[in-house]
Regions:
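Active-site beta-loop-alpha junctions of metal-dependent nucleic acid enzymes
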Residues: 96-97, 147-172
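Two-metal-ion RNase H-like nuclease active-site motif
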Residues: 112-126, 135-137, 181
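Basic, short loop/linker segments at the boundary and entry of helix-turn-helix/winged-helix-like folds
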Residues: 1-65, 83-87, 112
Length: 300
């Protein structure tokens, strides 16, 4: 160190140009740590025990998801409009069975994000405690590419969601992605862990903070943040009638059906079509019939 440098250091001992110790992080995650929350695998056996027709199941899902009614409201509408008598527990059983069947098929058919995507988490209430639902949405297709639920906002559920959306890093070594996010530190840790075994970064995190643009990054990627905030509001529309969930499994079931509905059944206003068209659903306008076809396709 030269005399001039020593004098600068004495004048400001916190000068980063003379920092002698640096923090280094290395992440060690097992694949079992990165599993996203999903329903149990009892769906086919549950659905085989359903005494009603698939059309009735489609009606239940149409009221429960498309319209956003609670299980008790769904029961009352089925009785008052269609003369179908089901208990609210039967409604929940149909929802649970359908979610368990659709979930594996949904994971196989989630699209990989394009060059630009956004990630965010939103809170839900489970057993009177705060939990979190995580989403990754693609800018171009407007499709949900990854989702997860957890009881914390830590790095592990954030990384699991990124793995669910992008797949393992080895499959993306020659690709580069931009992921817009908020200022939650878990995203930085998750992105660093995802990139750590690659010679070059695969995912570049872009932090968009606040409601107004106070920096160039926020201004450039504000549209991505707004995209996922709109997704969160749509999700909240479906969770609000429940006034919280009595169990984590109930929250998982609804979220699985929501992602399936959002990607494959719900027309997006800016696209004038669903984010991911399914040939079998072409020109099928009946909501119950759409759900019936989707369940049969997932169970095949």
């Amino acid at each position: 160190m030269t005399p001039a440098e020593r004098k600068r250091l004495e004048a400001n001992i916190y000068d980063p140009n003379f920092k002698l110790h640096y923090q280094y992080r290395e992440y060690h995650f097992h694949s079992s740590d990165l599993k996203c929350a999903r329903p149990d695998s009892a769906g086919p056996s549950l659905l085989s025990s359903i005494r009603s027709s698939y059309h009735t199941v489609g009606l239940v899902l149409s009221l429960f998801m498309n319209v956003g009614l609670s299980s008790r409201q769904t029961r009352e509408v089925l009785k008052g409009l269609f003369g179908i008598r089901l208990s609210h527990q039967t409604v929940l059983n149909y929802v649970k069975a359908s979610a368990a069947i659709i979930a594996p098929w949904l994971d196989r058919n989630l699209p990989k994000p394009g060059h630009r995507a956004a990630a965010d988490e939103t809170y839900i209430t489970v057993e009177d405690e705060q939990h979190y639902t995580w989403f990754v949405i693609d800018e171009l297709t407007r499709a949900i590419c990854g989702y997860n639920l957890s009881n914390t906002r830590g790095a592990v559920p954030a990384l699991a969601t990124i793995y669910n959306a992008y797949g393992p890093p080895e499959s993306n070594l020659h690709r580069r992605f931009i992921l817009a996010k908020d200022g939650l530190g878990s995203y930085n840790n998750a992105i660093m862990a995802y990139n750590q075994h690659s010679d070059r970064n695969i995912i570049f995190g872009k932090t968009v903070v606040g409601l107004s643009n106070h920096d160039d990054v926020s201004e450039k990627y504000r549209s991505l943040k707004q995209l996922i905030e709109r997704l969160n509001r749509t999700y909240k529309f479906h969770t609000r009638p429940r006034a919280g969930f009595k169990s984590m499994s109930g929250a998982i079931d609804l979220t699985v059906l929501f992602v399936a509905y959002y990607n494959f059944l719900r027309t997006h206003s800016s696209l004038h079509s669903v984010p991911i068209p399914i040939p079998e659903l072409h020109n099928i306008e009946s909501f119950p019939k759409q759900w019936e076809i989707l369940i049969r396709k997932a169970a095949a």
